[in-house]
Amino acid sequence: CVNKATKVLQFLTSESKEYVATLSLGTSTDTYDASGKIIETKEFHALDNNEIVACFNNFIGSQEQKPPIYSAIKVNGKKLYEYARAGEQVEVPTRSVTVNHLEILQIENNLIKFKVGCSKGTYIRSLCVDIAKKLGYPGHMSKLIRSQSGHFRIEDCSTLEDIEAGHFHMLSIEEAFEHFDKYVIEDENIVIHGKMIKSDIDHQV
């Protein structure tokens, strides 16, 4: 977003997200992803695919999730990763999140590739670690791609090469919010002077 569009960015980023991730079983790290320090290992033995599917299905719906200690969430005015880097102990609060759907795309040895649709604020790293624990293994997220944010899909995005070459389309605010309900205000002075607007739209406007 650029110029005036930055004022409405919060309404777009608050929508649901979709990711394609890979869970690696047998090794856990302090960051919950492949960039961290290994803290536990366990020899992997093949699991029954039906057992894996049943485990994943248990994570669909609303739940309390504990974020990774290496995250930007603030506790007492300080980011969690700052506590971690300083070697300080801190209680990591859980958050209410919702997993709308989970689809296993591929199972290959200790690697499970899956697609997940979830609410804003869901940590896929934590989801991977929690699923691994349910399956009886330490685990971490070894790969992550955000495939969709709200109505914006990755296949509709422009690459850096496209942008550098000038081959891209900049969405207008109207295009970006075309999937939102709209309320037309006849007199803009009503808004300017802060007058209450009556509407039968009870959600996003």
Regions found by a protein language model. Name each.
Residues 50-53, 111, 115, 133-205:
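Accessory RNA 3′-end/elbow-binding domains used by RNA modification enzymes
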Residues 1-156:
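RNA pseudouridine synthases
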